[in-house]
Amino acid sequence: MVPISRHRRLYLLNRLFLYTIISIVYGSEIHDKQINKSFIMFAGAKFNLVQNGDSPNRYIWLHGDEQTARMALEYHIGLYNGLAFFIESETREIPFKSTIVDPNRIFSRDGAYYALRKFKPGWQPGTLKMALDEIDRERESFLDILMPNKNGLLISLHNNFRGYNVHKEKGNSQRISIKKNENPRDFIICTNSSDFEILVSSPYNVVLQNELPERDDGSLSWEALRRNVRYFNIETRLGYLSKQKAMLKYIEDNLN
């Protein structure tokens, strides 16, 4: 028997892992309510995948310190079909190489550049480029699974507890609908004008962001916009679980 090199063995293991992930994502047509679980890695972070039935919809929880968003998504994916991504973290930033990064600031090379230098301004010659190249490679594999097809929705769930509110998004927004009875810290960002028209009639604050900014901060929303994906960010105050569950349900029931 010819011995298998270490490089070849790692290659085969990676191919097997990718095949397992793809089978989970696309191979659940037998039972609509079958729950499948696996994981994928991106930039040193582990994302647990939970799939319920067969749907193009994708959901993601990105910040480990936003636990209300996690609970809302766990509840939702048990009731509705789709594939949910849960980051395995308890903090906002995740460790990567010799620094930490915000996982919602590395969905473009420019964003990753600023994210890597935020907590570590000085890098040894050549090492920053190597780190960026590694994130680039992993990003493509991650997004191949995360991004839905043309009929699906991509929904990200976030919480705020530092004064962040809908008014801070006005500069990046093309259209705005603010409800007088709604707290400004509870709102929806969407990237599709037709979806915005429907959400205007909802009880929730909503902004439309369908033009790329001058400076790309690496957030998932801009990558979704570049790919013409129907993206939603459901943002609520930390601890307002019922609110976030209701907002998620509204999108599911009215925009599918």
Per-segment meaning from a language model:
Residues 1-2, 18:
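Short intrinsically disordered, low-complexity coil segments enriched in acidic
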Residues 3-13, 25-256:
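Structured catalytic-domain cores with a bias toward divalent-metal coordination
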Residues 15-23:
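Bacterial N-terminal signal peptides
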